[in-house]
């Protein structure tokens, strides 16, 4: 998908090709998921995962979910375009150790900071670790 993204940015391919590539990637992930999550892994905790409000991309998030399930974590997948309030409510309900936030669009990256601020306001920030990820995310942003 990195190559597809670069070709799209360079104008070599367009939205229809991007959609076909994403669909193909998802089908491939569906095939390998049982292999990645097979076996008896010790339960290591609960991770809430979601793509932030305004972003509809989930391939990277879904890859991380498969790897974390394979490592023994229970995953609560909130999907894409997740509202801050819904993330906060789920953190309270699930008592998770980790919250994973995903963004592919640079325009949605500020939502991650808003989620962290909302966690602080709700008195939840020190109760869990927050992981941010996505193609545009780097160490400086994190």
What are the residue ranges of the model-derived segments?
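Domain-level signal for soluble alpha/beta catalytic cores
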Residues: 1-141
